[in-house]
Amino acid sequence: MDFYKRALELKDETVADRRYIHQNAETGLELPKTKAYVMDKLKEYGLDPVECGEGVTATLGNGGRVLLLRADMDGLPMPEESGEAFACPTGKTAHTCGHDFHAAMLLSAARILKEQESKLKGTVKFMFQPAEETFQGSKNMIEHGILENPKVDAALAYHVSPGKMPVGLFMYNDKGTMMYSVDGFKITVKGKGSHGAYPHAGVDPINIGVHIHLALQELIARETDPAHACVLTIGQFKAGEAANIIPETAVLQGTIRTNNTKERELLVRRMKEVAEKTADVYNGSVEIEMISEVPPLICNPVSYTHLRAHETPEHL
């Protein structure tokens, strides 16, 4: 069977699936409308979907090695301003990262593979994942056994991308990292509140937070290999309610992104050390919480080789 030709035949249905999911964008772990739609479609195609944690899975095939096909399906907490007829009407959620595409494409893939199930040499397991944006979904489904029963031998996933790249272009990396690690952190600086006219009577957590922020940037400038891509960003800095009062606490939140495990471990460890020791110098303290701990995505060279073997010019 020409799978590419069959996919083109299903184009209108794939578009309709994408637009429904887009118009009903949901965020986080709980995606009731999206999950129900995915499960209904899989049942319509003859599969037997089940919940796996907060996600959905289904399996088909004839035994043997197991290939997992994964798509995320959550949106983002932001308003949509596209003006499209299928725009999300809530004003609070939107599919602006492409996960509506991913889920719709995997639904069509499931339909095509179900049609050809008798000819498959092996087993295909489908994974519809929530909460990719909050770094919770994959962990949730792994903890509920997505990689077991049957045990997964290899996995494939994809992500669409906007911009100037032509439609049909595939990007992958057979020599290293495809996507960076993401270690999200929250630093709560604890000081001592006082009136702004009497700073000597308190411990200023804003001052401590500023010094922590500046010191963290030196980790990239002086402690990581400039030939490697590493980024440390503080995206939130919140403190205080009044202009003339030194608050009790200040909160910094940020992310560390790297393309290798060695410097990921270095930066996470040094972030904690710098925050703790800087606070101590200024008579304060810190509480550090890791919000996310996602390793870098490194493409499997064997899977990459198999994928390349099935590419043909007319499909690229």
Please place each PLM-identified region on the residue numbering.
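Divalent metal-coordination and catalytic microenvironments
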Residues: 21, 69, 99, 141, ...
